[in-house]
């Protein structure tokens, strides 16, 4: 009977030692993760400090070259457009004037909205809003009927 009790005692001792060993490994693993977290945090802070130092040195250096447009390969294409977006958006000239009604008798205005072949120019060319483009085109058609503007170039 003594052998049975010793086996049970050794079995219970081994289970307790296994549990203790498992707890120790868990503690070690948590320590490792916390140390790696702290070490990465330290590395990150040192890296951010280095970056700020580099930025400060870049700002403090006043050894800039003078701007020469010939140094750029496509400098001739950028002339006249100093901003990066390019051209400014066109707007309707009739809206800017505040002119609501387009008179068919105003031939000078109507010729501005015609092509050299006396066709009605598109909105892409005239930069007119849709409201004024339709009013101008109707006025041109009326002026053609009344013979103020010819239908075809002679």
From Swiss-Prot:
This is Small ribosomal subunit protein bS18. SUPFAM superfamilies: Ribosomal protein S18. Transmembrane segments: none annotated. GO terms for molecular function: small ribosomal subunit rRNA binding; structural constituent of ribosome. Gene3D superfamilies: Ribosomal protein S18 (4.10.640.10). Belongs to the bacterial ribosomal protein bS18 family. Residues 20-32, 50-69 have a biased composition (Basic and acidic residues). GO terms for biological process: translation.
């Amino acid at each position: 009977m003594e052998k049975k009790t010793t086996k049970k005692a050794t079995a219970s001792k081994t289970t307790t030692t296994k549990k203790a060993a498992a707890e120790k490994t868990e503690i070690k693993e948590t320590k490792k993760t916390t140390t790696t977290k702290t070490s990465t945090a330290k590395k990150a802070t040192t890296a951010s400090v280095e970056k700020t130092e580099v930025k400060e040195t870049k700002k403090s250096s006043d050894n800039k070259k003078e701007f020469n447009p010939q140094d750029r390969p496509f400098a001739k294409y950028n002339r006249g457009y100093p901003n990066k977006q390019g051209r400014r958006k066109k707007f309707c000239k009739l809206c800017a004037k505040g002119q609501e009604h387009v008179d068919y008798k105003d031939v000078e205005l109507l010729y501005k909205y015609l092509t050299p072949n006396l066709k009605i120019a598109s909105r892409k060319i005239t930069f007119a809003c849709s409201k004024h483009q339709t009013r101008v085109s109707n006025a041109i058609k009326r002026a053609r009927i009344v013979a103020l503007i010819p239908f075809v170039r002679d």
